[in-house]
From Swiss-Prot:
Gene coding for it: ldha
Keyword field: Cytoplasm, NAD, Oxidoreductase
EC number: 1.1.1.27
Assembly and interaction partners: Homotetramer.
Reaction(s) catalysed (UniProt annotation): (S)-lactate + NAD(+) = pyruvate + NADH + H(+)
Naturally occurring in which organism (per UniProt): Fundulus heteroclitus (Killifish)
Top-level taxon: Eukaryota
Name of the protein in question: L-lactate dehydrogenase A chain
InterPro entries in UniProt: L-lactate/malate_DH, L-lactate_DH, L-lactate_DH_AS, Lactate/malate_DH_C, Lactate/malate_DH_N, Lactate_DH/Glyco_Ohase_4_C, NAD(P)-bd_dom_sf
């Protein structure tokens, strides 16, 4: 008799049950691992799968997490370069791709990452045909469109992390300005996750008090308090972090876990995430941009119709045209 047999006697033969909330992270770079640890620390999955082409790095990262299993609620952490390890995932977070270099725009990255997606997406679909795809790789809006096209999934199951982080950066900066917690500062960044994002100044409020009623010039050129600078800091935020530490990771990882939580817990929370916006706010082309969306167990269930000022709508359309200009050149 083995030690195990001496110690444990089975009452019944356990039937293998599938995981209810299996989360897969594709890509174990800085963003992938920050997303993985954020998901684990928030107890959002009963199994975590990691996938990457770099086998040693993948094995090392998985072992490192497994060694901490005692401190986590999730003890099943698996990793392989073979996508069969991802089978039956509820949410698949795609962070893989070429990393943005210092000074490189997110749009520059695009064709490099499209080619990577041509391998990744069909493999995800093969093993988790009912999953929700959460795309994080940059340029996220274009790559969410690419993932949607390559997967054949309905649009509600392909979501881009979009401006969820930009809006968090914006609310953090508002909080600093007013010495308040970011959760008490309300403001939305929509459009492209990147250089042409749009700050919805008309919706910025604290405790329901619209700041534009207190400062009608807020966000405009004639604003003595120069609030426009706050939005510029949001746009420059990632570039600044990349310049200082070489990459961004923690905030985007926490942002990803925030989105995963709304999905797996069916919270019906509203997030600014990237979705198909064709036919909304004057956008004519088949592009993905961030607007406020409701996330739950089925994925992206609803879209909130924002009241945008003509200037804000114009910026959104311009953002869409910029993305479409790049998209139509892509070879899928």
């Amino acid at each position: 008799m083995s030690t195990q047999e001496k110690l444990i006697s089975h009452v019944m033969k356990e039937e293998p049950v599938g995981c209810r909330n299996k989360v897969t992270v594709v890509g174990v770079g800085m963003v992938g691992m920050a997303s993985a640890i954020s998901v684990l620390l928030k107890d959002l999955c009963d199994e975590l799968a990691l996938v990457d082409v770099m086998e040693d790095k993948l094995k090392g990262e998985a072992m490192d997490l497994q060694h901490g299993a005692l401190f986590l609620k999730t003890h099943k952490i698996v990793a392989d370069k073979d996508y069969s390890v991802t089978a039956n995932s509820k949410v698949v977070v795609v962070t893989a791709g070429a990393r943005q270099q210092e000074g490189e725009s997110r749009l520059n990255l695009v064709q490099r990452n499209v080619n990577i997606f041509k391998f990744i997406i069909p493999n995800i679909v093969k093993y988790s045909p009912n999953c929700i795809l959460l795309v994080v790789s940059n340029p996220v809006d274009i790559l969410t469109y690419v993932a949607w096209k390559l997967s054949g999934f309905p649009r509600h199951r392909v979501i881009g992390s979009g401006t969820n982080l930009d809006s968090a950066r914006f609310r953090h900066l508002m909080g600093e300005k007013f010495h308040l917690h970011p959760s008490s500062c309300h403001g939305w960044i929509v459009g492209e996750h990147g250089d042409s994002s749009v700050a919805v100044w008309s919706g910025v409020n604290i405790a329901g008090v619209s700041l534009q009623t207190l400062n009608p010039n807020m966000g405009a050129d004639g604003d003595s308090e120069n609030w426009k600078e706050l939005h510029k800091k949001v746009v420059d935020g990632a570039y600044e972090v990349i310049k200082l530490k070489g990459y961004t990771s923690w905030a985007i990882g926490m942002s990803v876990a925030d989105l995963v939580e709304s999905i797996v817990k069916n919270l019906h929370k509203v997030h600014p995430v990237s979705t198909l916006v064709q036919g909304m706010h004057g956008v004519k082309d088949e592009v993905f941009l961030s607007i406020p969306c409701v996330l739950g167990n089925s994925g992206l269930t609803d879209v909130i119709h924002m009241t945008l000022k003509p200037e804000e709508e114009k910026q959104l359309v311009k953002s869409a045209e910029t993305l479409w200009g790049v998209q139509k050149e892509l070879t899928l």
